[in-house]
From Swiss-Prot:
Pathway: Amino-acid biosynthesis; L-proline biosynthesis; L-glutamate 5-semialdehyde from L-ornithine: step 1/1. Its cofactor is pyridoxal 5'-phosphate. The gene is rocD. It comes from the Bacteria. Belongs to the class-III pyridoxal-phosphate-dependent aminotransferase family. OAT subfamily. One of its GO terms (biological process) is L-proline biosynthetic process. PANTHER family: AMINOTRANSFERASE CLASS III, ORNITHINE AMINOTRANSFERASE, MITOCHONDRIAL. InterPro entries: Aminotrans_3 (IPR005814), Aminotrans_3_PPA_site (IPR049704), Class-III_PLP-dep_AT (IPR050103), Orn_aminotrans (IPR010164), Ornith_aminotrans_bact (IPR034757), PyrdxlP-dep_Trfase (IPR015424), PyrdxlP-dep_Trfase_major (IPR015421), PyrdxlP-dep_Trfase_small (IPR015422). It catalyses: a 2-oxocarboxylate + L-ornithine = L-glutamate 5-semialdehyde + an L-alpha-amino acid. The modification N6-(pyridoxal phosphate)lysine is found at K257. It comes from Bordetella pertussis (strain Tohama I / ATCC BAA-589 / NCTC 13251). Catalyzes the interconversion of ornithine to glutamate semialdehyde. This is Ornithine aminotransferase. It is an enzyme of class 2 (transferase). It is found in: Cytoplasm.
Length: 411
């Protein structure tokens, strides 16, 4: 029988909360490093990292200390006034990424919307595209956020169904299909928005050489290449930005999530004078964007990533995790990914991935399913080889006991 407190909590959530999520049936109360703890004190290995927002691990003490210190001094001024934390964040991001202009926002979706506004305005004012005719190319199975503007160019029926009419000006092409991208370009194309690795689609990597072709095309046709690194960036793939694996540089880079280490919503648009210089006072803004608390937290989160070798660890442990995953028994169709952004796709007859997530949860491991048959595996970047070995033991048990023809669920 569920405890009375749990029953009351569930009833309140059901009655008062909007039902736009379907979480696993665990109630978490505490986190530390790679571990999460439920209200009964049971421990779980976090293999989602809040969609890569807690790359540095839960409740990292250095980020927490920076947040508390700044919260005791100054939290919010709005951008109506200057404050002493903004310039240092600009310098840190410029040094780490090579960006010449930085525009801080809050959520990842806000950063995406900001970039879309900037490139449209750039297209009209710098490229001379006729007013109201700018086109932006995006990819099928994309995920860039949940705002009305963004879901308008989603191809996910759940994400876009029932929300129209949508803004015009977006062309959808298959991810990784350079010929399709090339054919979609017109004189009115101002930008190509793309994820280096499609996360929500199931950790889908592009074909080798694809992004070098994309970079060349965008340069030749004066098209702004926007890389959405909100999930792939900040060490997740074993490089500070995933573009490094492709040997290219985007014109606009979007970062967020782990930019705060999970403590606070912080995102940023990184670009150059040509694109971000297009905004004049009053043409774009955000009350909380670039606030003192956000800047202090982001700077600490960036320092922790580098000082503690987390990016190198993601590369090394990611390669080891991939090797172990490929050796797993059971109904595994494919293992793919880069660094610690990994996915295990099940065979079509293996049953829904969510059932495997539920069985893994019962064994102390929290994993998120996506697109029906795929398990996403993205632990914090501090994960150790021993913890990976333990995770693979749980996966092996669940896969072996859940395969078609097996005796049923795990013991």
């Amino acid at each position: 029988m569920p405890a009375p407190a749990a029953t009351r909590r569930d009833r309140i959530e059901d009655e008062l909360g909007a039902h736009n999520y379907q979480p696993l049936d665990v109630v978490l109360a505490r986190g530390s490093g790679v571990w999460l703890y439920d209200t009964a004190g049971r421990r779980y290995l976090d293999c989602l990292s809040a969609y890569s927002a807690v790359n540095q691990g839960h409740c990292h003490p250095r980020i927490l200390a920076a947040m508390v210190e700044q919260a005791q001094r100054l939290t919010l001024t709005s951008r109506a006034f200057r404050h002493d934390q903004l310039a240092p964040l600009y310098e840190d991001l410029a040094r780490l990424t090579g960006a010449h202009k930085v525009l801080p926002m809050n959520s990842g979706a806000e950063a995406v919307e900001t970039a879309l506004k900037a490139v449209r305005k750039w297209g009209y004012e710098a490229r001379g595209v006729p007013a109201g005719q700018a086109e932006i190319i995006v990819c099928a199975n994309n995920f860039h956020g949940r705002t009305l503007g963004i879901v308008g160019f989603s191809t996910d029926p759940d994400a876009r169904g029932g929300y129209g009419p949508f803004a015009p000006g977006f062309t959808v092409v298959p991810f990784g299909d350079f010929a399709a991208l090339q054919a979609a370009v017109t004189p009115r194309t101002v930008a190509f928005l793309v994820e280096p690795i499609q996360g929500e689609a199931g950790v889908i990597l592009p074909p080798p050489g694809y992004f070098r072709q994309v970079r060349k095309l965008c340069s030749e046709r004066d098209i702004v290449l926007i890389l959405d690194e909100i999930q792939t960036g900040l060490g997740r793939t074993g490089a500070f930005l995933a573009e490094a694996h492709e040997g290219i540089e985007a014109d606009v880079t979007l970062i967020g999530k782990a930019l705060s280490g999970g403590f606070y919503p912080v995102s940023a648009v990184l670009s150059n004078q040509a694109v971000l210089g297009i905004f004049q006072p009053g043409q774009h803004g955000s009350t909380f964007g670039g606030n003192p608390l956000a800047c202090a937290v982001a700077r600490a989160a960036l320092r922790v990533l580098h000082d503690e070798g987390m990016i190198d660890n993601a590369r090394e442990q990611g390669a080891y995790f991939m090797q172990r995953l490929r050796a797993l028994p059971g109904p595994v169709r494919e293992v793919r990914g880069r660094g610690l952004m990994l996915a295990l796709e099940l065979e079509p007859d293996a049953g829904p991935a969510r059932a495997y997530c539920e069985r893994l949860m019962a064994r102390g491991m929290l994993v998120k399913d996506t697109h029906g048959q795929t398990l996403r595996l993205s632990p914090p970047l501090i994960v150790t080889r021993e913890q990976i070995d333990w995770a693979c033991a749980q996966l092996a048990h669940v896969l072996a006991h859940s395969a078609p023809g097996s005796s049923g669920g795990p013991s």
